[in-house]
Amino acid sequence: MNLYATILAGGSGTRFWPVSRVQVPKQFLVLQGTQSLLQATVQRITPLIPPERIYVVTAAHLQEQTVAQLPEVPAANILSEPVGRNTAAAVGLAAWHLMRVDPEALMVVLPADHAIADSAAFCASLQRPLWRLNMPICS
């Protein structure tokens, strides 16, 4: 099992207006501490998934800003949506890309704009179902 993370970071920021805007959507805001919500999402998942297996799907106009925010994630792993078509299309783009990179990939999809206080509990909640994937279906 090859576990990858896909972080959805293509939001336009209109629902959190006036704090977030089209050029500075919610995922780039620092709501607590010193990290943006996007940076905190990457840090939160890194104990389970190394940066080279983290992919971020973002809007084309946010590509450079996303790369700049995440120096630990390879720039090639920042996928740009040609046109924003919401969640299903972004997940589909990442799945299509990962299928080409690693046919054995298992993808965890995460939003970039959630504030989660207990990172250890979050990672533990992701690990619980993963062990079942290594169990045989029939014995």
Task: Show which residues each predicted segment covers.
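Conserved N-terminal catalytic core of the sugar/cofactor nucleotidyltransferase
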Residues: M1-I7, R15-P18, V22, Q27-P111, ...
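A short, conserved acidic/glycine-rich loop-to-beta-strand motif
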Residues: N134-S139
